Regions:
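Mixed-charge, polar/low-complexity N-terminal
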Residues: 3-5, 9-10, 16, 66, ...
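A conserved beta-strand-loop-helix scaffold within acyl/acetyltransferase catalytic domains
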Residues: 1-53, 133-146
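Acyl-donor binding region in acyl/amide transferases
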Residues: 41-105
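Terminal substrate-recognition subdomain of acyl/acetyltransferases
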Residues: 76, 82-146
């Protein structure tokens, strides 16, 4: 994904907006998660490891992010896209957005067509997943403690 220069640029341009959670075993770095800190939100996006460690992904991507939010009184934690396993850990499904520029017109048309179908499928998926939400609902709104 990202090269060394990417991380150097992040550290120089937005050092106060970065949170990196690292995991070590026997004084060796074995994994890390990259988060972006907003005014009222923490955004988790990328993680990596050198091997397959039981529950390391959940610890570095979710549990440590939750602890950071509690400690720093951050109201919202968006741990990243995808993953049915997030529901059982207290997260609800939410829409995310992205922007892309596709120069080739035929490719752009094909992607737009696919995204139209995909967005309908995602909408249905979110509705299905919300049925398993750990939060009470009232008038189609999810009640959460802030």
């Amino acid at each position: 994904y990202f090269n060394y220069e990417f991380f150097v640029e992040l550290s120089l341009s937005i050092p106060d907006k970065l949170l990196i959670i690292t995991a070590e075993h026997n004084a060796k770095l074995i994994g890390a998660s990259l988060f972006f800190v907003g005014n009222e939100s923490l955004y988790g996006r990328y993680w990596g490891t050198d091997n397959n460690y039981d529950s390391l992904h959940f610890e570095t991507c979710y549990y440590q992010g939750i602890e950071f939010c509690i400690k720093n009184k951050i109201k919202h934690f968006e741990p990243g896209t995808g993953g049915e396993h997030k529901i059982s850990r207290g997260f609800t499904a939410s829409k995310t957005r992205s922007a892309h520029y596709l120069k080739h017109p035929d490719f752009s048309t094909a992607v737009k067509r696919h995204l139209h179908i995909e967005s309908q499928n995602i909408e249905r998926y979110i509705q299905d997943v919300q049925k398993h939400s750990p939060y009470k609902t009232n008038n189609n709104c999810i009640n959460r403690l802030a």
